[in-house]
């Protein structure tokens, strides 16, 4: 099980910046150690356990890049219309049977190995075959044209894939090109997910008139699944300090991370912070971020705990910027910083200094046809699920920014990039 050191970070006073909070969490979590071999067809999205070096040069042999005719560069014609006898034919997957004779050509196809002596290929579109079956070649082709040398892509023994990589389809393809059938990956981390609050009912169960159906839990579980986690749905914990403490302690024994939403603010019925202190240690609480200020992080029996706000937009935003990097660190993944795309603001906005804010926006083509501009969603409430559904992403406004004017360059994070 991933462990978190048991020293408490002194919180209070000014709210902590997002970067400070993430840095503190990063120093206190360690990656899961267990490694498992998975079939290569199941490796997409998993975290590579160790480096992979090229066990085979790519390509493993020198081959033709086009359909055409292979010749010796010493025989390249200096004038138009020189005819060469065709003394062989090599298809992809076949081996060259004999060297190319001086003054001869060999019919060759894309991917076929180059015959001994040949080092240049004429594209079939650039030649013609005369009545005698000879190939008539143009002048001016450079030596080595249209040939892929062995190891052109990757040399034998070269570093290919680095440990900690979150494997993508193209990474899986590279491993397959080396002939691998299995890949060693870190085991999936186990995450327990709770919602908290008497005001919540689970979908499919009776809902009282003053209750809402729980949506955060399913959003968070879906986001965790996209990050490759093994997720335990532990339902809804009621607003009872003792029950919360008991549920958190029980989850800590069998999971690598505990994640809750709701109950981390300062209201009389917000018991999560106190429950964490009853069974563990609170490391930090409250961040300078909007939406999402009430975020709690602690340790319970060595297991990291993160408590997110109950408002769905705040929960979404803080998941992206706090939970996501924590999950990657626990999983043994390389850091994957989010890189905002520069766009032009098509809105006016004012904010407090020293607080990072995220504005929900849609993208559209700029009126002058150059680049994209961000259009602010008309409503700002942190409880508006529709504001996440009906927008393309978030504009990130750093701590130093106090206002945004139309035409100003801002950073955009598309939802597709956030997990």
Model-derived features with residue positions:
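Short, low-complexity N-terminal leaders and the immediately following helix N-cap/first helix
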Residues: 1-79, 333-358
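Predominant activation on well-ordered alpha-helical scaffold segments within soluble catalytic domains
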Residues: 22, 26, 67, 124-125, ...
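Short, glycine/charged-enriched hinge/interface segments at domain edges or termini
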Residues: 2-16, 69-233, 238, 373, ...
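Helix-rich terminal scaffold detector
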Residues: 1-19, 181-308, 312-318, 329
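Structural signal for hydrophobic packing residues in well-ordered secondary-structure cores
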Residues: 26-33, 51, 114, 158-164, ...
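Generic structural signal for well-ordered, non-membrane alpha-helical segments
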Residues: 14, 18-22, 36, 40, ...
């Amino acid at each position: 099980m991933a462990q978190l050191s048991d020293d408490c970070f002194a919180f209070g006073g000014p709210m902590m910046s997002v970067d400070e909070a993430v840095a503190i969490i990063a120093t206190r979590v360690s990656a899961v150690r267990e490694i498992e071999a998975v079939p290569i067809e199941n490796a997409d999205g998993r975290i590579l356990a160790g480096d992979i070096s090229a066990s085979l040069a790519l390509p493993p042999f020198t081959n033709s890049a086009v359909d055409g005719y292979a010749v010796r560069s010493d025989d390249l014609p200096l004038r138009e219309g020189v005819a060469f006898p065709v003394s062989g034919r090599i298809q992809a997957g076949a081996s060259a049977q004999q060297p190319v004779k001086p003054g001869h050509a060999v019919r060759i196809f894309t991917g076929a190995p180059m015959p001994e002596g040949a080092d240049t290929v004429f594209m079939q579109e650039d030649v013609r075959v005369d009545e005698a079956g000879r190939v008539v070649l143009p002048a001016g082709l450079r030596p080595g044209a249209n040939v892929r040398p062995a190891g052109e892509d990757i040399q034998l023994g070269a570093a290919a894939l680095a440990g900690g990589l979150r494997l993508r389809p193209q990474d899986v393809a590279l491993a397959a090109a080396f002939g691998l059938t299995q890949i060693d990956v870190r085991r999936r981390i186990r995450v327990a997910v709770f919602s908290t609050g008497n005001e919540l009912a689970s979908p499919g169960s009776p809902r009282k008139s003053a209750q809402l159906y729980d949506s955060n839990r399913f959003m968070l579980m879906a986001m965790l699944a996209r990050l490759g986690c093994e997720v335990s749905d532990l339902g809804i914990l009621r607003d009872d300090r003792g029950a919360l403490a008991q549920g958190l302690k029980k989850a800590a024994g069998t999971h690598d991370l505990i994640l809750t939403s709701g109950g981390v603010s300062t209201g009389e019925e917000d018991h999560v912070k106190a429950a964490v202190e009853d069974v563990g240690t609170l490391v930090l609480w409250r961040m300078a971020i909007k939406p999402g200020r009430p975020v709690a992080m602690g340790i319970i029996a060595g297991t990291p705990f993160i408590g997110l706000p109950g408002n769905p937009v705040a929960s979404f935003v803080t998941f992206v910027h706090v939970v996501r990097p924590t999950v990657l660190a626990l999983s043994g993944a390389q850091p994957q910083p989010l890189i905002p795309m520069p766009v032009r603001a098509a809105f006016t906005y004012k904010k407090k200094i020293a607080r990072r804010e995220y504005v929900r926006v849609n993208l559209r083509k700029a009126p002058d046809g150059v680049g994209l501009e961000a259009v602010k969603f008309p409503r700002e409430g942190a409880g508006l699920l529709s504001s996440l559904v009906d927008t393309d992403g978030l504009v990130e406004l750093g701590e130093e920014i106090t206002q945004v004017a139309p035409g100003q360059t801002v950073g955009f994070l598309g939802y597709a990039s956030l997990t």
